[in-house]
């Protein structure tokens, strides 16, 4: 569901890892909805930074994709009574023409699912324009996003074609597809195993498969099974960086 108004009064609500705005949270509380906040701790950390910067009267630039759930939630954490302003920058062109009220009192946050390489050029341009800009901490970036992108670059060295399991409206899945193509490898975004049959696989001897952050493991395995029916064998699983970061479940679910 996209709106709280769609949820009945006796419904149980789970807020996604993308996070929510203060307005949405207050609406849920005012309706006495039973809800579980599954916001990613990295996103919550950025929310707290936005509130802290705003309380200090600073201007804030956020690098991210307009209308992305995480971005909407983070922008919605900026207090209306702050003396500062918050600005969204999506690309380097917007960075070049951006004007702020307090160039000497300016902070930067980013959408957590954008890797360092995704934002590098924009950050450089902003630092060039605003030398006093306070940069975000590297630990604010989703480690899983960076690891997946690094793994795709490695996978591209060994594959004739790469399937990215994920939906077209997933920004991190789309980015994986773009990275594979930038490495000179044909890449397709698929969210249904049956769609693989419509892809031209002529000359494709080695097929690589990766997945966006929100793609369930079950769907990935269905893709692998479908490829097996097309004559492809699972030869190896590339071992990327071992992730050893674990987050606790919300207290209500423990």
Task: List where the protein language model places each region.
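The feature marks the mature, well-folded catalytic cores of soluble enzymes
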Residues: 1-211, 217-254
